């Protein structure tokens, strides 16, 4: 995969699986996302510039006991199969929840060439993701796959009430 390339993979989960996943996400415990430009979470939250909410279900290659991991593993396996990635290690499952007016920053998930980011959308929203300064709107059951060292940022919804996604970080081996 080239550094500036974004691969879109559709129809990873059925509509029923996505609805069940969203139901799990609605009842899951969430944490305020740390904003890169603030040392304190309270000020940006009350100023309407909070970064949304997130929760990890796998960190540094170690899974947590989470009801979200079943779908995350399935999505990761399907993406790697379609991209013919045979040897990889899952480093992170990070779930995000955004509301209108949330503030996000451009960032990199990793800094070396051997990592890929998989961004999965369980529903269609008017939010999306900027990758290499190009906007990709959320589409139900679609994954956006790109080099983790590429700058990107989530974009909250403006008309839709909430936006969920899964960010998977994998290390690929040759």
Please provide the spans of the model-predicted regions.
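Non-heme Fe(II)/2-oxoglutarate
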Residues: 1-87
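Catalytic core of non-heme Fe(II) oxygenases with the double-stranded beta-helix
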Residues: 56, 61-174
